[in-house]
Amino acid sequence: MANYYTDHPEIEFHLNHPLMKRVVDLKERNYAEKDQFEDAPVNYEDAIENYKRLLDITGDVAANIIEPNSEDVDLEGPHLENGRMIYASKTFENLDATRKAGLWGLSMPRRYAGLNLPNAIFSMASEIIAAADAGFQNIWSLQSCIDTLYEFGSEEQRQKYIPRICAGETMSMDLTEPDAGSDLQRVMLKATQDEDGTWRLNGVKRFITNGDSDIHLVLARSEEGTKDGRGLSMFIYDKRDGGVTVRHIEHKLGIHGSPTCELVYKNAKAELCGNTRLGLIKYVMALMNGARLGIAAQSVGVEQEAYNEGLAYAKERAQFGEKIINFPAVYDMLSRMKAKLDAGRSLLYCCARYVDIYKALEDIARDTKLTPEERQEMKKYTRLADAFTPLAKGMNSEYANQNAYDAISIHGGSGFIMEYKCQRLFRDARIFSIYEGTTQLQVVAAIRYITNGTYLSIIKEMLENEVSDDLKALKERVAKLVELYEAAINKVKEANDQAVHDFLARRLYNMTGDIVMSLLILDDATKAPEMFQKSANVYVRMAEEEVLGHSAYIQNFKAEDLESFKA
């Protein structure tokens, strides 16, 4: 029987990473709840076994319910009835299956009926579900919006809303408007207070994923007369209170099971989450960082499924009297797909572990004073998480698109036929590098860590890691790429021209990702050569190809060259 967890032992490899011990010890606060809750682990080993059981259940549901439903969901999609969004019929089956399996409220504390799982484990479950159906993964993974309410909401709000999400109610984050896409400081949905202090929301939200959810986090303008981000606050809207209707459901290229809605707020009752004026500059940034990690996991799931589809077809398809998997042009594509998958997954879980450590320490700090060592640790991992999140989202969303493209190429003409899954993967993946911040915006988020030397210091530290003897030559090649990378950064900084900086930023970003993932996959191949040695060989060569090209481009670029590129 298929299982999307046990069929891919690479996921369990990352579950057993040495840093997971620190992650789990912090998340479980040294197992303080072992006598209070029946499902609380007594030690690290017990926690890991719990995670394996949950991921095994997730893999079973994904392979045997969600994936078999995926084609019907893609064909039917959601529809509109009297101002309400109605899911595709099989989506209701998926929701029911995940609720019965206990796959809701994963990250929330047990006192609110959650499972208290680390972000790394939630990301693994997200990857597994996305491999089965990326559209449904959107609906399911938006439960992570509750993390923002947990962090910034009141205790009364936590007790009111978190148990509902843990029971399987759905969420959405209502940020985008017709005139406020990437530029969220232009949000104009109005928040006003009645005489009794009740907040009311009026206006329109657009492109809202799962927009008719049970509980919404809404970005709205609470400060009259303001036009920038400092006038925006975060609100909680409960569908039970009414006041919001769905005006339109978008007819999209892909992720058909995930409803994308235009919402009309008419005097909708809402609750302020946190403090006024901090909606965009603090709360949405936290919300978006979580969402970006979610898209990285979604991307890795589709990278895996696209590779699976391409590999299976190449093994069975024969041309010129031979299976096409034996043709160099085909196994070149497949090896690159696998290398991107393995390196991208390593980056995803590396980032998730960093997020886990700083988030757990932040949570502990709400109840007790951190030691100086813990404060230093939180500062370190906050910096690492902030640096790695835009890399994980941007690089993996691009890799998902590339793997889906190559899966179709391997299928040839059959890949262009709707009966084959690879066409759906291609359509679904296209949005990954757009929503929750385009790849260009991930570059904007990452560039300061490039120019201030953060990535370079991380990379040089990673270069100190020992690799197995048969990988040392590859590591030396990566070390030479680091020299080119440092020279490229210096060349761009010396230009002292913002337009040049912006134009070359994407190339520096790609170089960063290529080098970081080269070092990660070398580390993985040292620990598990049977799993990752081939991918390490392929990925480092692929990175070398990319970095050398970007280096030459940057070193030969002059400010006056910009004129050739302007429309």
Residue ranges and their predicted role:
Residues 2-5, 10, 17-19, 255, ...:
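Alpha-helix capping/hinge segments and adjacent helical runs
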Residues 59-60, 90-163, 167, 209-211, ...:
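Internal helix-loop-helix
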Residues 198, 202-244:
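A short core secondary-structure module
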Residues 240, 247, 259-291, 308-325, ...:
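A glycine-rich, basic-preceded beta-loop-alpha segment at the flavin cofactor/substrate interface
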Residues 1-81:
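Extended, charge-enriched "interface" segments that sit outside catalytic cores
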